């Protein structure tokens, strides 16, 4: 059983080296780490030249695409499983790969994503949002969960998510030419094809952002656009209720702790 890790990067700093060190210290080791590097002044090839299991594929900035770049890397791999990560997500311990792989023992499961824990400098709103989207309880999600979970049935995050490669290829992989949300679009297709997605709450990465109001608005706007652009996945599945539930719970949390 072989696992390859795929990480798109752009102007990476020291956090990438720490990420690679943590990946190569896992109880279940990756066979190969494929870095999809968008060219910049940072000489990624030179920085990583001494890393034996790291391959760097460089592309021009205009070539980068959230879905297409990841799909290109997937097709360079012959591993059994593909772990996609972002350059700013760090394994919380040495058991990330082992625990993320475990749900695949259920033959329905063709994708599994990790729990995201906030960084120490994370703001209170983002910290609460992380706990809302990434709770302490693991769950297997499939088509029969749609009445209960709605659009969250399709939720999956390529900040840290593993996929069975054979099914990934047979399903057509990530959508090409998409500004955002390639993970959820693919996951929705999986569920609609009769497969399941696992949320592995014991597989943890440290990953959060301190978005400004305008940045959060832009992200939400892009998310909405991606859903409109893919009615074959999202048509007839309401997302407003989940958003309203998050707003209400966040407001109640802020009132309870006395922070805006």
Predicted regions and their residues:
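A conserved acidic beta->alpha catalytic loop
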Residues: 37-45, 90
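Acidic donor-binding loop at a coil-to-helix junction in glycosyltransferase catalytic cores
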Residues: 179-186
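Short, well-formed alpha-helical segments that are part of the catalytic scaffolds
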Residues: 12-25
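Short aromatic/hydrophobic "clamp" motif used to bind/position activated sugar donors
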Residues: 82
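Glycine-rich, basic loop-to-helix element that forms the pyrophosphate-binding segment
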Residues: 60-77
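A recurrent flexible, glycine/aromatic-enriched loop bordering the glycosyltransferase active site
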Residues: 143-163, 179
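Conserved donor NDP-sugar-binding/catalytic core segment of glycosyltransferases
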Residues: 90, 94-127
